[in-house]
Regions:
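A detector of single, family-specific signature residues
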Residues: 1-208
Length: 208
C-alpha cells in the first residue's frame, strides 16, 4: 500500500476536518428542523444565510423554545465560522500549489476537488495509465465472469476514496449542467448522455 508523505497527510487532515465541521453544521440544522416540526413549524427554502432569522421568527412567541433555539443557533454559528476558517485555509493552500491551479483551470473543478485529487494521488508515478487512476477512485465498472465465461460489466465499483470520487462526480456534474462555455469534454459527455443517460455521462466525464 502507498504511504503518503507527511505534507500530503497534513493537507488530507485539513480536508477531512473541514468536511467534518460542515457535516456537524448540517446535523445541527436538521436537528433544529426536526425539533420544530413537533410544533407544526417547517423551516424550508431559507438558504444558509436566512436559516437563523427564519428559526428565530418562528419561535418568537415562545420564551422557552426561543432560548433553546438561541443556544442551538449560537452553536451552529460558531461551527459555521470555524468551517469557513478551514475552507479559507484550503483555498490558501490551493493558491500555493501550481498543480492545483492547473486542475482548477478545468471547468467545474474548484479548490476542494483540486486539493482532494492532488493529495489522494500524492505520487502520480505509481499509476501507469489514466484508467488506473479512475479505477483507484472506483469510477470504473465492476467486471465479473458469468457462468458462460462471458466478461460482464456492471455499475462502477465505488472502490477507494469516497470523498474524492464524490468531488470528481460533482465537478463533472457542474461541467455538464452549469458551465455555459464550450468544452471538448462537455461535448463528449453530452454525446454519451444522448446514447445512454445523464448519470453515466457524468461518471464518464469524471473519469476524464
Amino acid at each position: 500500500a502507498h504511504i503518503k508523505t507527511e505534507s500530503c497527510y497534513r493537507l488530507r487532515l485539513l480536508l477531512t476536518q473541514r468536511r467534518n465541521l460542515k457535516r456537524k453544521v448540517l446535523d445541527l440544522e436538521n436537528t433544529i428542523r426536526h425539533s420544530l416540526k413537533a410544533f407544526g413549524i417547517r423551516i424550508k427554502g431559507t438558504g444558509r444565510t436566512g436559516f437563523d432569522k427564519a428559526v428565530r421568527e418562528a419561535v418568537a412567541g415562545d420564551a422557552l423554545t426561543s432560548e433553546l433555539m438561541d443556544a442551538m443557533l449560537t452553536a451552529r454559528a460558531a461551527l459555521w465560522k470555524e468551517y469557513g476558517r478551514l475552507h479559507d485555509l484550503v483555498v490558501k493552500m490551493v493558491a500555493k500549489s501550481e498543480l492545483c491551479r492547473r486542475f482548477m483551470a478545468i471547468p467545474g473543478v474548484g479548490p476542494v476537488t483540486a486539493l482532494s485529487f492532488m493529495t489522494a494521488i500524492d505520487d502520480p508515478t505509481r499509476f501507469r495509465r489514466s484508467r488506473d487512476v479512475a479505477a483507484y477512485f472506483g469510477l470504473t465498472s465492476r467486471r465479473w465472469q458469468s457462468g458462460t465465461s462471458i466478461d460482464v460489466q456492471g455499475r462502477i465499483s465505488k472502490a477507494g476514496d469516497a470523498d474524492v470520487r464524490r468531488s470528481l462526480y460533482e465537478a463533472a456534474s457542474g461541467l455538464m449542467t452549469r458551465f455555459k462555455g464550450k468544452d471538448k469534454v462537455k461535448t463528449w459527455g453530452q454525446q454519451i448522455a444522448k446514447r445512454s443517460c445523464h448519470r453515466k455521462a457524468v461518471v464518464a466525464v469524471a473519469r476524464k
